[in-house]
Amino acid sequence: MNILKKLLWFVAAACVLFGCADDRMIYKPGSGSGNSGNGGGGEQPSGPGDYSKLTAANHPRIIMTEDDVMAIKTKLTAGTDANLKKLHECIMAYADKALTAKDLVYEVKGKRLLDVSTEAANRIISCSYAYRLTGEDKYLEKAEKDMQTVCAFKDWNSASHFLDWAEMAHGVGIGYDWLYDRLGDATKKSAEKAIQDYAFYCALNGKWNLNFYTSATNWNQVCNGGLVVAALAVYETCQDDARSIIDKAI
């Protein structure tokens, strides 16, 4: 996959996970009912997955690697790819806006923490990208601060609205992976614990109606996407749970 395609995938994923994550489930928690699509989108993967490269020495690894970062920098410097330039400027603009944004606060509206989760994920991902591309500490510091804030929340609202948790796990997972070599040990430990307690535990122990695994709504992409990103990010710290999450999603 070339660099432009990877960045386009990133932007598309952001649109799905952030822009389209509204409440479209047609069943209630614990009801056991719901829309369970039959798939049919192509061949299913077979055989055991290869997890051998998911080590502490191999970050960043989700969506883009360090080689991809260097290739993006080279293309941007050359100035020959107008589409890449526009995408880069769009992400950087969001990161710059995030630098002066107010601190995130645990605020549930109705049954949702979704607005906070969306803002957290957008900030963390855009600032993590900005740091990898520019090396400017202001982006690292902002992303790390927002990660620390949401990981100190009492929960990610998974008991009431699973989309909230999924977006939070996606943002923290990307921040953890892309900034791994620069995050403080306390921040990494906090992220690992939050992902385990607020995400994996809820999914693996049936704390929500788990029909999102086969649902034909946006809950499938958002919930499975957030779970898998988080599992890939912290795999080496909780291999059994992370592998269970990934295998079930696939």
Language model: regions and residue ranges:
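Bacterial Sec-dependent N-terminal signal peptides
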Residues: 16-54
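Generic cytosolic/nucleocytoplasmic N-terminal low-complexity/intrinsically disordered segments
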Residues: 1-5, 27, 34-37, 141
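Short, motif-level signal for alpha-helix interfacial/capping segments enriched in acidic residues
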Residues: 42-45, 57, 112-116
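Detector for intrinsically disordered, low-structure N-terminal pre-sequences
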Residues: 10, 15, 25, 61-62, ...
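Aromatic-lined, polymer-binding surfaces characteristic
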Residues: 72-77, 83-92, 96-250
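N-terminal mature-domain "stem" immediately C-terminal to a signal peptide or N-terminal signal-anchor/transmembrane
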Residues: 47-93
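Short alpha-helical segments used as structural interaction elements across diverse proteins
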Residues: 2-3, 58, 70, 120
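Sec-dependent bacterial lipoprotein signal peptides
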Residues: 1-18
